[in-house]
Amino acid sequence: MKSSTIPPMYAAIDLGSNSFHMLVVRHINGSVQTMAKIKRKVRLAAGLNENNTLSHEAMQRGWDCLSLFAERLQDIPVENIRIVGTATLRVASNVDIFLEKANQILGHNINVIEGEEEARMIYQGVAHTSGGNGRRLVVDIGGASTELIIGEGFEAQALTSLKMGCVTWLEGYFKDRALTQKNFDSAIAGAKETLAPILQQYTDLGWQTCVGASGTVQALQEIMLAQGMDEVITLAKLKRLQKQAMQYEHLEELDIDGLTLERALVFPSGLSILIAIFELLNIDSMTLAGGALREGLCYGMIDELQHDEVCQRTIKSTQQRYQLDVEYAQQVTDLSIQLVQQCGNDWLTEPQALPLLTAATQLHEIGMCIDYKKGGEHSAYLINALDLPGFTRAQKHLLGELLRRYREYFSAMPTQHAVSDISAQRMLRILRLAIILTHRRDVNLAPAVTLSEKNDVLSLSIDGTWLAANPLTRSELEIEADKQTNIGWDLVIDARD
C-alpha cells in the first residue's frame, strides 16, 4: 500500500495537574477514529509547595510518564502532534527546569497554554464530540483549575479558567482526609467564593444545556449508573453521593459502589466543586461530554472538520464505514418525517426525538454487515459498541433498542432515559411503518399515504387499488397492524376507494 493512502495519524498530549493523558487518532472517512488512549496518574499539583515550587519528586513522576508517551510519538508526523501543559505548569515557579528535560524526553516542545486558551480548546473538543442544539454551558474540573465556557455551535461566547481543582481543593479543604460536614461545607463555600466574580456574566448569557467534560464528571456518572440511576447528573443526585461519602470517616475508608480506587482520593473535592457550581449557577441537569481538551487539540489540526454538524458527520462516516445504502436510508428518513408531521408537530414531545428517529432511519440496516439473520440484534449491538460522537450513552441505548425492533423482533420499548416512554413508543411505530412502506427501495414505487392519530390510535390511509396491486405490502401492513394492536398500540389500515 502506498503511504499516501494510509489515513493520517494525530496525537494530543495534555499534561494535566492530576493526570497526564495521550490521545492518538486517525482521520478516516470524514471522521476521527480513536486509536489509543493512554493515561497515567501523576498528581503534579500535589507537588507544589506554598511558594509554587514544584518538587523534584513530582517532576520525576511527570518525566517517567513522558518517557512512556515518547515511544508512541515516534510513529506520528511532527506536524500532527500537539502537546500542552495546563494549570500546574502555568503557576510553577521552576517550570523551566521541568520543561527542559520534558522536551528532551519527548523530542517535541511543550506549549504551556493560558487558562483562556485551555477553555477555548476544551470547548472545541466538546463541540466536535457532543450533540445538542442551542447555547451550552461547559464545565471542566481539572486537578488545579476549573474551566467554564458558554458557547453555541463551534463558537465560544464566554471563557473562564478558575484556580480551583480536585487536587488543590483536596489539599486545601480535605488535608486531614476527614469526610465531615465541616470539610464539605468549607470546600463548597470556597468554590462558590471563587465562582462569584463570573456569576453575573454567565447568568446574563444563559444556556439551554449543560455538559461536564472532566474525569470528575465521568466518575460521578459511572457511580450513578453503577447504583441504578440514569446518566443525567442533578443536584439531588450529587447531594445523595455526598451523604454516601459522609458515611465514612476518612478518605482511605471510602467505598462507594461504582467509585474506582483511582478516583477515590479526589472524589470528595471534585464533588464539592460541582455541588457549588450547580447551586450557584442554578443548573438543572448535566450530561457527560464526548470530549474535551485533547479532542479539541486533535480536531484543531484537521481543517476539513472545523464546521461540520457533529451528529451528521458521525452518521455519514458510519454509513461509509459499513457500506450502507444511503439513498434507501434517506427514503426511509423522508417518509418517517412525513408521517410524524402528519400526526402533529408536538406528537414527539422532546426536541431531540425527531433527530434521534432520523439517526435510527439512517443507520437501521447496519447490522446486515454482519448477517441478515438477526439483523436487528446485530444493529443494536453495533450501535451500542461503536464510538458515535454527538450521541450520549442514553441516546445510543435508545437507538439500539429501536434498531433491535426494526424488523422481525417486536415488543414494547424497555426503560430508557433519552426521551419519554411515549415518544420512544411512537418513534418505534413510525420506524417500522416507514420501513414496510419503502421495502421496494424505490421512491417512485412507494404509495401515497396519510397517517392520522387520535389518543395514540394510528390510522394509515392508503389507496386500495395500490394495495390490491401490491399484495405483499398489504400483507405486511396487516401483520404489523395485528402486532401493534396486540400490545395495546392500536393501528388501523384504511384502504381508500
From Swiss-Prot:
Its EC number is 3.6.1.40. GO terms for molecular function: guanosine-5'-triphosphate,3'-diphosphate diphosphatase activity. It catalyses: guanosine 3'-diphosphate 5'-triphosphate + H2O = guanosine 3',5'-bis(diphosphate) + phosphate + H(+). The keyword Acyltransferase does not apply. Transmembrane segments: none annotated. Keywords: Hydrolase. InterPro entries: ATPase_NBD, GppA/Ppx_hydrolase, Guo-5TP_3DP_PyrP, Ppx_GppA_C, Ppx_GppA_N, PyroPPase_GppA_Ppx. The keyword Cell division does not apply. It comes from the Bacteria. GO terms for biological process: guanosine pentaphosphate catabolic process; guanosine tetraphosphate biosynthetic process; nucleobase-containing small molecule interconversion. Pathway: Purine metabolism; ppGpp biosynthesis; ppGpp from GTP: step 2/2. NCBIfam families: PRK11031.1. Catalyzes the conversion of pppGpp to ppGpp. Guanosine pentaphosphate (pppGpp) is a cytoplasmic signaling molecule which together with ppGpp controls the 'stringent response', an adaptive process that allows bacteria to respond to amino acid starvation, resulting in the coordinated regulation of numerous cellular activities. Belongs to the GppA/Ppx family. GppA subfamily. This is Guanosine-5'-triphosphate,3'-diphosphate pyrophosphatase. The lineage of its organism: Bacteria, Pseudomonadati, Pseudomonadota, Gammaproteobacteria, Vibrionales. The gene is gppA.
